[in-house]
């Protein structure tokens, strides 16, 4: 505020100086014209600048005073100019004071708004800080509630364990009560046995006394009888002796029976006493059990960890077993596909054998046709040696017949060539299929070896093992059947060389006939015979190719036989793996039983 007052005073003196120096009054009007219009919404200036107007009035008064002096000195003409200058100076002073007040109001408004913004920012920061603290309190409260829930769950588990321990102690107390009751019963039985033993001893004592009395009475009677009659004495002595012996025997029998009964009761008592000793041992066992329960409570946590580890291992073992079962199923499917491929190959071999039989039949018919050709050639020779008159006509007829026969032979040879070509194609297909079968068999061997290595440590279900064994056996049976078919094919191939030899003989005969009948062959078109010879050569080459293909088939069959032997070894390995799986299953059952016992103890 003092600075504002100083600024106002400086502005007042500055505005009054032109009037004192005699400045032109138009300067104030120009300044007033150059000033911008006031803002429409400018707030009213604060009342603080009002004291600044008092120092501004002094220059005006001074100006008026000076003007008065000047006017008084200069005359009436100068008084009007001085009044206008004073009015201009007053307007300039008023405009400068208004601009200063406006600037000061703007600065104060800016400071006020800046303070409001700072207060709002500070309040927002405080609210944000308070919200973060509230969130932290909520989080801590949630953590505390979670800890309370966990503690509640732990307390519930402890309560359950305490209840189970109470139940076990209740059972132990019931067992103790039953053992005490049995002990009371045994004590009562011991007392009863002692009373019976005392009663038996009393009875025996009475019997002894009675016997002694009888003996003493008998002795007295004998003494009296001696005096009376010796004969009657003997009779009475004998009677009394017999009676005494009977009574003694009866008493001895009774005594033995009583002794046996007493011995049985004593044995029963001994057994009961032993059971009582066992009950005392049970007390000691109960104490040991209490200590063991405490130890179990202390080691329960470690056992829980062990149980979790066992569960995890069992789950991993189950997952591995499931994967192995899936692999076994896939292997079973592949073996079924292999079986189907073997069946198809068997059918192809059967078709090939049928084609071979047909070719053999056609080849077996060739010698007859060649014989017919020889006969026709002989007839042609005989016709050629006949009279020359009918030679042209007969020659033409023979030539036509020979052409017809050659055409028939060509058709038959073409049929044979077609059969041989089909046999070649079938043999090529057979070799390709056998190669594919060999590759598949090698893959199966590798997979079986890998599966056997895995099955040494893991187990699978008996149904899958039985199914795998059955599939392997069926595959072995199909391979045996295929082996039989291939053996038949070998036999048929073994018969092929004889047919080739017969074809060679026929070819030689044809060559000889052609050499003998060169003149007749010169008349006939030789190109047909050359074609026939070339067809026979082609037939021979095709037959040799068939022999080579059949040799390849033999090697493939031998490899299949070796593969069947490998399959038998794989079956044996699978049986051994099955035994290992049974052992593993038994070990797993024992492990489960141990785990259940641990659960029961816990």
UniProtKB/Swiss-Prot annotation:
Domain of life: Eukaryota
Taxonomic lineage from the root: Eukaryota, Metazoa, Chordata, Craniata, Vertebrata
GO-annotated molecular function: RNA binding
The protein's name in its UniProt record: Cytoskeleton-associated protein 4
Regions of compositional bias (Low complexity) in chain numbering: 53-64
GO CC term (a single one): specific granule membrane
Extracellular side: 128-602
Keywords, sorted A to Z: Acetylation, Cell membrane, Coiled coil, Cytoplasm, Cytoskeleton, Endoplasmic reticulum, Lipoprotein, Membrane, Palmitate, Phosphoprotein, Signal-anchor, Transmembrane, Transmembrane helix
Originating gene: CKAP4
Positions in the Cytoplasmic compartment: 1-106
Topology in the lipid bilayer: Single-pass type II membrane protein
Keyword Cell membrane: yes
Region named Disordered: 1-83
Transmembrane domains' residue ranges: 107-127
Residues recorded with modification Phosphoserine: 3, 17, 19, 232, 312
């Amino acid at each position: 505020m003092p600075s504002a007052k100083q600024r106002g005073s400086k502005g007042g003196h500055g505005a009054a100086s032109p009037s004192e120096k005699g400045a032109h009054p138009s300067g104030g009007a120009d300044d007033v014209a150059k000033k911008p219009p006031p803002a429409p919404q400018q707030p009213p200036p604060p009342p603080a600048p009002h004291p600044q107007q008092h120092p501004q009035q002094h220059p005006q008064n001074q100006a008026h005073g000076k003007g008065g002096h000047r006017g008084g000195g200069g005359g009436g003409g100068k008084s009007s100019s001085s009044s206008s200058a004073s009015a201009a100076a007053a307007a300039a002073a008023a405009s400068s004071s208004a601009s200063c007040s406006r600037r000061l109001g703007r600065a104060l408004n800016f400071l006020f708004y800046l303070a409001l913004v700072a207060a709002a920012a500070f309040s927002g920061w405080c609210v944000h800080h308070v919200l973060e603290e509230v969130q932290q309190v909520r989080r801590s409260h949630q953590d505390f509630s979670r800890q309370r829930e966990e503690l509640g769950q732990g307390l519930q588990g402890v309560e359950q364990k305490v209840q189970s321990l109470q139940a076990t102690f209740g059972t132990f107390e019931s067992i103790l009560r039953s053992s005490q009751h049995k002990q009371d019963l045994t004590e009562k039985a011991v007392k009863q046995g002692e009373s019976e033993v005392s009663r038996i001893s009393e009875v025996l004592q009475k019997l002894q006394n009675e016997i002694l009395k009888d003996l003493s009475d008998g002795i007295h009677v004998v003494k009296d009888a001696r005096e009376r009659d010796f004969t009657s004495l003997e009779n009475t002595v004998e009677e009394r002796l017999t009676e005494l012996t009977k009574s003694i025997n009866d008493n001895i029998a009774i005594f033995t029976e009583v002794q046996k009964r007493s011995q049985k009761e004593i044995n029963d008592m001994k057994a009961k006493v032993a059971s009582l000793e066992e009950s005392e041992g049970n007390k000691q066992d109960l104490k040991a059990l209490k200590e063991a329960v405490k130890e179990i409570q202390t080691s329960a946590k470690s056992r829980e960890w062990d149980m979790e580890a066992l569960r995890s291992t069992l789950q991993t073992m189950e997952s591995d077993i499931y994967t192995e079962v899936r692999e076994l199923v896939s292997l079973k499917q592949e073996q079924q596909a292999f079986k189907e491929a073997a069946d198809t190959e068997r059918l192809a071999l059967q078709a090939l054998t049928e084609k071979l039989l047909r070719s053999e039949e056609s080849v077996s018919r060739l010698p007859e046709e060649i014989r017919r050709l020889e006969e026709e050639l002989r007839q042609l020779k005989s016709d050629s040696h006949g009279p020359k008159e009918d030679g042209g006509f007969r020659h033409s007829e023979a030539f036509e017949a020979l052409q017809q026969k050659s055409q028939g032979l060509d058709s038959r040879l073409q049929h044979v060539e077609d059969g041989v070509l089909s046999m070649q194609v079938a043999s090529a297909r057979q070799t390709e299929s056998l190669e594919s079968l060999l590759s598949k068999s090698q893959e199966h061997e590798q997979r079986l070896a890998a599966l056997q290595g895995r099955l040494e440590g893991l187990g699978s279900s008996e149904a899958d093992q039985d199914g795998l064994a059955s599939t392997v056996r069926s595959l072995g049976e199909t391979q045996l059947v295929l082996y039989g078919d291939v053996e038949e094919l070998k036999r048929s191939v073994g018969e092929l060389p004889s047919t080739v030899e017969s074809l060679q003989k026929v070819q030689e005969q044809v060559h000889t006939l052609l050499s003998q009948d060169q003149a007749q062959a010169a008349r006939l078109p030789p190109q047909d015979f050359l074609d026939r010879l070339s067809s026979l050569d082609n037939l021979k080459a095709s037959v040799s190719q068939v022999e080579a293909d059949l040799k390849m088939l033999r090697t493939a069959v031998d490899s299949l036989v070796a593969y069947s032997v490998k399959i038998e070894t794989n079956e044996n390995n699978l049986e051994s793996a099955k035994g290992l799986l049974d052992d593993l299953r038994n070990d797993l059952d024992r492990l489960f039983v141990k785990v259940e016992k641990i659960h029961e103890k816990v």
